[in-house]
Every structure is written in structure tokens, then in C-alpha cells.
Swiss-Prot record:
The system is composed of three essential subunits: KdpA, KdpB and KdpC. This is Potassium-transporting ATPase KdpC subunit. It is a single-pass membrane protein. It comes from Photorhabdus laumondii subsp. laumondii (strain DSM 15139 / CIP 105565 / TT01) (Photorhabdus luminescens subsp. laumondii). The chain crosses the membrane at residues 8-28. One of its GO terms (molecular function) is P-type potassium transmembrane transporter activity. Part of the high-affinity ATP-driven potassium transport (or Kdp) system, which catalyzes the hydrolysis of ATP coupled with the electrogenic transport of potassium into the cytoplasm. This subunit acts as a catalytic chaperone that increases the ATP-binding affinity of the ATP-hydrolyzing subunit KdpB by the formation of a transient KdpB/KdpC/ATP ternary complex.
Length: 193
């Protein structure tokens, strides 16, 4: 009977430590040391929350850059069902999806002969990636410039200004946060002469 009592005491003790004390301590420290990140890296414009730096969102208008496709079900970029599509590279369904996406992107961007960057036609592992490659942004630049009646050089400079470099070259490739890039677009004057 003594072993049962000590087991229950140990269970209660570990539950309080790992289920209450540790989460409260971790949350409190993160709120003190990293408040922006602890709150989800929410991006605000004019006092309104417009999204998170960490979660992609759909942009369908021609005046905006588009992100990677979402692999989530129900609706795009659904954080409750994040995860990859789990389709193998040899799966014909994935092949058909990629072909369909390539055709849609070529039509939407009026780029019938230019290769479509792979990150515009494949979802990330989480299905929620907010970043695209500089090549993916360049692929869309002419469409965005035309839709906004801006010179292409203005859009190309904005792309360069929004490239985020990894801390070291072996830790990843340069990326662009689509939400930040689109907000920077919205902050440009409507026409530049």
C-alpha cells in the first residue's frame, strides 16, 4: 500500500511541476523577454492586426504577391489542420496538382515561357509557410507592377529591400515574407512618375 501512496504523491508532484509550474514559468519569461514573439509575431497596420509574420495567408488580387500554396484542408492556411499534404513525389495526384498550379500561375502572371519557381507550386511541410524565395517574387513582379501602374524597377527594388537573409549561408536561403512585402506595397504611392 505504501507504493501506491508514493506513486500518487509522485504523480501529483510531477503534474504540478510539468503541467503548471513549468508552463507558467516559460510563458512568463517569454512575455518578459520576447513579448512580440510570445504574442504570435502579430503584424499591425493602423492599429489593426493584419496577420502574423509566422503564418501565411491567401492573397488573390493581382496587386499582391502570392505565397506558397497551402496544404491545409477546409480553407487555405488553416492553422488548426496544419501539416503537409503527405503526397509522395511519385504520387500522380501531386504531379497533377503541380501541373494545374503551374498553368494557373503562368496564366495569372502572363508568363507562359518562364519556368515557375518550385516554391510557388509546392506547399511547405507545415502548409502554412509565410515566405517565398526571391525568384518567386521576381516571377510575380511584372504582374504586380502592371496591376499597380508602377515601374518594374520600383517593384524589383521593393523585393530586394524585403529579402531576409539567414544568420549564416549554411542555415538556409534568403526568403521574403509575403505579408510584409504586400504591406510595403500598400505603403507605396499609387503611381510613381
Amino acid at each position: 500500500m505504501i507504493w501506491l501512496r508514493s506513486s500518487v504523491v509522485l504523480l501529483i508532484f510531477l503534474t504540478l511541476i510539468t503541467g503548471v509550474a513549468y508552463p507558467l514559468l516559460a510563458t512568463g519569461l517569454s512575455e518578459l523577454m520576447f513579448p512580440y514573439q510570445a504574442q504570435g509575431s502579430m503584424v499591425k497596420q493602423d492599429g489593426q492586426t493584419v496577420g502574423s509574420e509566422l503564418i501565411g495567408q491567401p492573397f488573390t488580387k493581382a496587386i499582391y504577391f502570392q505565397g506558397r500554396p497551402s496544404a491545409t484542408v477546409d480553407y487555405p492556411y488553416n492553422t488548426l489542420s496544419s501539416g503537409g499534404s503527405n503526397l509522395a513525389t511519385t504520387n500522380p495526384i501531386l504531379d497533377d496538382e503541380i501541373k494545374r498550379r503551374v498553368e494557373q500561375l503562368r496564366q495569372f502572371n502572363r508568363q507562359p515561357d518562364i519556368p515557375v519557381p518550385v516554391d510557388l507550386v509546392t506547399a511547405s511541410a507545415s502548409g502554412l509557410d509565410p515566405h517565398i524565395s526571391p525568384a518567386a517574387a521576381d516571377f510575380q513582379a511584372q504582374r504586380v507592377a502592371d496591376a499597380r501602374h508602377l515601374p518594374i524597377k520600383v517593384i524589383k527594388q521593393l523585393i530586394r529591400d524585403n529579402i531576409e537573409h539567414p544568420p549564416s549561408e549554411f542555415l538556409g536561403e534568403p526568403v521574403i515574407n509575403v505579408l510584409k512585402l504586400n504591406l510595403a506595397l500598400d505603403n507605396l504611392p499609387e503611381k510613381k512618375q
